[in-house]
Regions:
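ATP-dependent small-molecule kinase catalytic core of the GHMP/sugar-kinase superfamily
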Residues: 1-105, 118-156
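Conserved glycine-rich beta-strand-loop-beta hairpin in the small C-terminal domain of fold type I
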Residues: 113-115
């Protein structure tokens, strides 16, 4: 059996350290709008000198360690989102639907366009999924796993 476990990257992603992940009770809604996002353009559009809201990774790691999903969700920040959401308003629209359906927090993943929301109730995530499916095809409700993700097949 092969597993991908909860690892946190540091530096430019080359340093990995194990951290405890979300509890198995956390429901995650993932929505990938049918958009192309150029990672290169997003990074070129990022003004490092004028980033107003940066993630406090040490604090977020402490939230994970303590299992405080509410505090984690309300403090999630993605600095790249300011750039991508200016190019594609759908990012904020998707987050709004998730938050209106009681997501504890929602944000874009990486340079986008995928958006995820953390929920403590599956019925809320399913309600948001139903709304999002009216406009987007790739919408998924999943649960976190304490053991990691099982990968069927071999790593190459």
């Amino acid at each position: 059996d092969k597993f991908i476990t909860g690892l946190k990257s540091f530096g430019i992603g080359e340093e990995l350290t194990y951290i405890k992940g979300l509890s198995k009770d956390t429901v995650i809604l993932v929505c990938k709008p049918n958009l192309f996002v150029s990672t290169k353009e997003v990074y070129e559009g990022l003004d490092l000198q004028n980033i107003k809201n940066r993630p406090d990774n040490k604090f977020l790691i402490e939230c994970l360690k303590k299992g405080n999903i509410n505090l984690l969700a309300t403090n999630m920040v993605n600095v790249l989102e300011t750039v991508t959401s200016k190019m594609h308003e759908e990012i904020k629209d998707i987050e709004k639907v998730m938050l209106e359906n009681n997501a504890l927090g929602s944000m874009m993943s990486g340079s986008g366009p995928t958006v995820f929301g953390l929920f403590d109730k599956e019925e809320d995530a399913l309600s948001a999924k139903g709304e999002l499916l009216k406009k987007y095809n790739q919408v998924y409700v999943v649960r976190s796993s304490e053991k990691g993700v099982e990968v069927n097949g071999e790593f190459n």
